[in-house]
């Protein structure tokens, strides 16, 4: 599948869909913004404001960010899934679907601000394409992963950590447009996941690429993920923010 070249500029439920490569999707460009390390509330407020201000001509965007430690609880989430009340990690209640999850250093978070009507995408199709992008990203590092029916996200396919969750997904659709997105664990302190039932599942093991013996660079994985998201969403793209915003340490 061909994708338009990426340019660098500066600046801070049915399953049917248009066939991949259709003109309708190529006419919907994507802007990729590398936001660096950013407080969760800042990103949350920004994507809500972006969505509220959208017009029919607003280009779609993907935001790549890393958050300081934070738990987020979906709009229908059960607070009982936070098992340790005094963990020292803040909890933010948000308007996405799903239960509780954790974001922290060493994790890639990708927010997808898309006009689904313009892309002729149904929500279930969008979820499938996001999951496929993550599966393809992990495959690039020789990691086999799978979906689970009724449990959005991506899971290790087999081995000692078979069934463990390595990526989470949660979206909000407002006026036909999506925000929130996915998180992919690269090299994290995984202990905060022990204080929750991840995504509402008691005892669910959470892993990162490092615990699967893949010494991957955060930047490299982020670039691979962006490429696979663009390919699966089939949009022309322009990457935003200065290249130095991509600098990241896995230490």
From Swiss-Prot:
Belongs to the LipB family. Coiled coil: none annotated. Its EC number is 2.3.1.181. Substrate binds at residues 96-103, 168-170, 181-183. Keywords: Acyltransferase, Cytoplasm, Transferase. The keyword Phosphoprotein does not apply. Signal peptide: none annotated. It is an enzyme of class 2 (transferase). It is found in: Cytoplasm. Residues 56-241 form the BPL/LPL catalytic domain. It comes from the Bacteria. It catalyses: octanoyl-[ACP] + L-lysyl-[protein] = N(6)-octanoyl-L-lysyl-[protein] + holo-[ACP] + H(+). This is Octanoyltransferase. The keyword Transferase applies. The record marks 165 as: Lowers pKa of active site Cys. InterPro entries: aa-tRNA-synth_II/BPL/LPL, BPL_LPL_catalytic, Octanoyltransferase, Octanoyltransferase_CS. One of its GO terms (cellular component) is cytoplasm. It comes from Burkholderia vietnamiensis (strain G4 / LMG 22486).
């Amino acid at each position: 599948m061909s994708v338009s070249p990426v340019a660098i500029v500066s600046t801070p439920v049915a399953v049917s869909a248009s066939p991949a490569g259709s003109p309708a999707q190529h006419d919907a460009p994507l802007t990729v913004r590398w936001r660096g390390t950013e407080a969760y509330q800042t990103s949350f407020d920004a994507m809500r404001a972006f969505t509220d201000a959208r017009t029919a001509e607003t280009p779609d965007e993907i935001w790549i960010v890393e958050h300081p430690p934070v738990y987020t609880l979906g709009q229908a989430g059960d607070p009982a899934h936070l098992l340790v009340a005094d963990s020292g990690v803040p909890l933010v209640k948000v308007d996405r679907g799903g239960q509780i999850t954790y974001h922290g250093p060493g994790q890639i978070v990708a927010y997808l601000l898309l006009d689904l009507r313009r892309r002729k995408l149904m929500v279930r199709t969008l979820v499938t394409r996001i999951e496929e992008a993550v599966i393809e990203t992990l495959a690039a590092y020789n990691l086999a992963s799978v979906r689970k029916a009724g449990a959005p996200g991506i899971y290790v396919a087999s081995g000692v950590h078979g069934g463990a969750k390595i990526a989470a997904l949660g979206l909000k659709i407002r006026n036909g447009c999506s925000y929130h997105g996915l998180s992919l664990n690269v090299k994290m302190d995984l202990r905060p996941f022990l204080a929750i039932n991840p995504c509402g599942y008691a005892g669910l093991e959470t892993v990162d690429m490092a615990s699967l013996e893949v010494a991957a660079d955060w930047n490299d994985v982020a670039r691979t993920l962006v490429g696979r998201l663009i390919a699966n969403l089939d949009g022309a793209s322009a990457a935003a923010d200065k290249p130095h915003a991509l600098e990241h340490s896995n230490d």
